[in-house]
């Protein structure tokens, strides 16, 4: 057991430092092509590259371990200190991805066929997950790899609506203006704003506002973007109507939308992950997340799906991303034990 653990940790250190050294913000995933070509050869895993999104799939089989290769912007030089690995994506989600790759490799060596994907664009519009849907990929079971503290199993995510609002007004000289588009729309923003408070209450948050071209002229046009988050029990249509009614003089356009997801705690993937953790004397916790992930998209392939991964989720998108080799080992072991159980059901 000790020998296996040290093998996994050494391989994780090697692969994760290599992958962290490659800067892959959303839409730049092709930068990792040589990395995936090399590990495909070294680990004897068939490689498929999805052409529309530059997503990577390794291995074969009806079970998918799905993580993502893209990160948020801002490169962080990778380093290792006392078995802690630092770098952009160490937590979200190259650490979970490397855990999944190693698990896939070890399972493949045992004759258990499973696929692992480094999907593209999860941090933006999930074009990698959407390409799997568009091309009718079929999997019986899916585990999504996102940081969940190596103990938590995510069974629910909120949905999101990304809404552009374009408004027009009459430009006037600022010294004598009777109307001001910025002031008028600002009042409406305050009225429609819903601060993120708890999971079950929807949030409506302005994230971008642009208006005006001259110091002394009130704007003729104003652009506003709202980021809307809602749980599965909230009514999407009511949220859209509330905003539409508040901005009747403006043009509204949904530029991206991700549905909420909630899966049964009795589905086979959730159960297998829970048992895998218990076998390691780790108490599993079922949780719901306020954000979104590729699980929201991939639920269209199968409802036998859940999210789990190593890494402290509080460090996502921060400049302090770090993950321990022990966490990665727990992730590898959990994926392997869960899939060995699921494999028996196919």
Swiss-Prot record:
InterPro entries: ArgE/DapE_CS, Bact_exopeptidase_dim_dom, LysK, Peptidase_M20, Peptidase_M20_dimer, Peptidase_M20A. Zn(2+) 1 binds at residues 68, 92, 146. Its cofactor is Zn(2+); Co(2+). Pathway: Amino-acid biosynthesis; L-lysine biosynthesis via AAA pathway; L-lysine from L-alpha-aminoadipate (Thermus route): step 5/5; Amino-acid biosynthesis; L-arginine biosynthesis. Keywords: Amino-acid biosynthesis, Arginine biosynthesis, Cobalt, Cytoplasm, Hydrolase, Lysine biosynthesis, Metal-binding, Zinc. GO terms for cellular component: cytoplasm. Binds 2 Zn(2+) or Co(2+) ions per subunit. One of its GO terms (molecular function) is cobalt ion binding. Zn(2+) 2 binds at residues 92, 123, 317. Pfam families: M20_dimer, Peptidase_M20. The active site is at residues 70, 122. Its EC number is 3.5.1.130, 3.5.1.132. It is an enzyme of class 3 (hydrolase). The keyword Hydrolase applies. It catalyses: [amino-group carrier protein]-C-terminal-gamma-(L-lysyl)-L-glutamate + H2O = [amino-group carrier protein]-C-terminal-L-glutamate + L-lysine; [amino-group carrier protein]-C-terminal-gamma-(L-ornithyl)-L-glutamate + H2O = [amino-group carrier protein]-C-terminal-L-glutamate + L-ornithine. HAMAP family: LysK (MF_01120). Catalyzes the release of L-lysine from [LysW]-gamma-L-lysine and the release of L-ornithine from [LysW]-L-ornithine. This is [LysW]-lysine/[LysW]-ornithine hydrolase. The lineage of its organism: Archaea, Thermoproteota, Thermoprotei, Sulfolobales, Sulfolobaceae. The gene is lysK.
